[in-house]
């Protein structure tokens, strides 16, 4: 795979270059000491790079979170159904991530009545106008549904990696509609790795190091969780929103959660701040 290198005299020159059409944002892998940018050629849809893991549904996954500048960058934090994201530095000042400042909660009383995607309107899946991936990236980008997350677990090799590059492969246990992924005894060390998170790669690879060398993998960084004006568990746990309400509870929505002890698709309070990852391609949602 071709790699490119561009040098800058200072950080201001780098920021100015980012504003030009020569800057390919989705392909930037990292910025070193404020004067170097390395990036890799990847397939692109509507200006954002994706990885094709050969999934049965044909779903293509974005290589980075919405708001991120690289695959290891945490990106922005979003409440479910909100399209405005916030940096970690803005949490606690511009955004609390609580019912009191959630876009779909009335605050006139203590119950914080849900105003959309509730038992009255019976909407269970985000409309594209409320989909953070679609609103911010356009094209055919949208947030993944629960079925697309479960497909990732069942159709790839995957596992948790520490910021020291220690990878532990996970194994899926459950049905087509539910289950969890837990650590196995299979481990590996990835050289020059410095960000904790979760890795997915094709079953055809013998080891995670082969997939990393081929740059043929999906990585989701452990960006933590926002709530009550704080960002917690950064570098330990990660969470990424799905596009549908949690079963039987309009106050919660599905999300992919992971850590060093396990991973799966669970429910979380809608007001919480999590990462958003875009996908291209459709898959029928699980109905129950």
Label every PLM stretch briefly.
Residues 3-8:
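A short, exposed loop/beta-hairpin motif centered on an aromatic-Gly-Thr core
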Residues 14-20:
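A short, charged, amphipathic alpha-helix used as a generic interaction element across diverse proteins
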Residues 25-288:
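Conserved positions within compact, well-structured domain cores
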